[in-house]
Structure formats: C-alpha cells, structure tokens
Amino acid sequence: MVEINNLTKRYGNITAVNNLSFTVSKNEILGFLGPNGAGKTTTMNMITGCLPPTSGTIIVNGFDISKNPMEAKKSIGYLPEIPPLYTDMKVYEYLKFVAGLKSVPRSQRNEQIRDAMDRLKISDVSKRLIKNLSKGYKQRVGFAQALLGNPEILILDEPTVGLDPNQILEVRKLI
C-alpha cells in the first residue's frame, strides 16, 4: 500500500530525512519514533504529497505520489500535527465541506459525516463553531475529517495531542 524507496529531504545543507526505505502493507500499522527534529513529520508530509522529496520514490496504492499525486492522495486520510481547521465554521459544516473536497458522493456525505462524528465522539458539538472548542475536540474534528471518504491509508501525526487520558484510549482503540 505504501512503498518508500531511498527517500531523502534536504533543506540547504541540512538533511532532514536521509535515504529512508520501508514498506507498509494492507492492515499494518507503522509508527515513527524519534526525538524532535528526526524527520518524522517531514516524512509524513512527503508521503501525503504536501512536501516534495529531494530524491527517492513514494508509491501509494500503486501510484507514484510525484507522477500521479491526485490518484495517490485519493487513498490517504491525513491528520497533520496541527489540523488545518476552518475555525469560523461549525463542526458539521466543516466536515461537509471536507467531504465535498474529497468528492464523497452527495448521497453518502451525511452518513459518512455522522459515522465519523460518532466514532470520534464529537456529535454533541456538531453545531458549535470550531473556534469555541477545546484543543481535544479540535483534534478529534481533525481526525474525523481524515476518515471521510473511507481512505485505505491513514497517516496520523501526533493524533492524541491535546486529548485527555480517556480520549487517548478511545483513539488508540479506533486506530
């Protein structure tokens, strides 16, 4: 599903990721561990097509992310470290907007949104403005948007940041 070959990212003289190779098959979970600045987020940004590599290849569901980015991205649900939320939107409106961006068929949007909100336990705040939510709720809204479209691949950067201990357990179960 994800194949990384000789992936490198340099910023001038600084090498953030150096010759990284790995494969993740269907139903596998892979976690990156390392200190701050080790290249974990940089690697995830390259896999999702948000950041071009200096060299190497990234194959997502059979598509090279640099040659067929739109096809590769259709398979990915991404929760960045800081979710890019439109804070002046209500939770449900935002998720509906994202579902449209992800080309979720109109006939399936409401069901997928309800399912994602139920799974992340955010249904009770669906009519609230995102800017008025706690950090934990904002994180869960970001996670919910990653689930829309039923992606085959989830890439989650620090998915439990800002969550309380019970929420952390729930998210780990979901993963």
Region annotations inferred by a language model:
Residues 129-133:
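Conserved ABC ATPase signature
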Residues 143:
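Hydrophobic anchor residue at the start of the ABC signature
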